[in-house]
């Protein structure tokens, strides 16, 4: 079992007034560090999310013409692939 520290109440495991007084000077710095760390991590997350989720409609990319024969062949390949995947499940 864990031994309680001198700075903890042995019955409730709460910090004693001495421990609270000892930690008081560091509260502001620790909170500043926490806010800075969360801000940087959140900023990176938001930047990445916005960079990856741009509205790309690919309007400037030319689409090559597809003949009816090629389209029919692609549809057959797609249907065959779908059947194979369904059989695997």
UniProtKB/Swiss-Prot annotation:
GO cellular component, one term: mitochondrial inner membrane
Protein's cellular compartments: Mitochondrion inner membrane
Transmembrane region(s): 29-51
Positions in the Mitochondrial matrix compartment: 1-28
GO terms, biological process: mitochondrial cytochrome c oxidase assembly
Keywords: Membrane, Mitochondrion, Mitochondrion inner membrane, Transmembrane, Transmembrane helix
Signal peptide: none
Membrane protein topology class: Single-pass membrane protein
Main location: mitochondrion
InterPro entries: Coa3, Coa3_cc
Segments on the Mitochondrial intermembrane side according to the record's topology features: 52-89
Primary role: Required for assembly of cytochrome c oxidase (complex IV).
Family statement drawn from the similarity comment of this UniProt entry: Belongs to the COA3 family.
Subunit structure: Component of 250-400 kDa complexes called cytochrome oxidase assembly intermediates or COA complexes.
Protein name: Cytochrome c oxidase assembly factor 3, mitochondrial
Phylogenetic classification of the source organism: Eukaryota, Fungi, Dikarya, Ascomycota, Saccharomycotina
Gene assigned in the entry: COA3
């Amino acid at each position: 079992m864990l031994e309680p520290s001198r700075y903890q109440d042995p019955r409730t495991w709460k910090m004693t007034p001495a421990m609270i007084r000892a930690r008081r000077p560091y509260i502001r710095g620790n909170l500043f560090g926490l806010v800075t760390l969360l801000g940087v991590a959140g900023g990176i997350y938001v930047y990445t999310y916005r960079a990856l989720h741009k509205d790309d409609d690919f309007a400037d990319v030319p689409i090559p013409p597809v003949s009816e024969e090629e389209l029919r062949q692609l549809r057959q390949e797609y249907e065959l692939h779908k059947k194979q995947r369904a059989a695997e499940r």
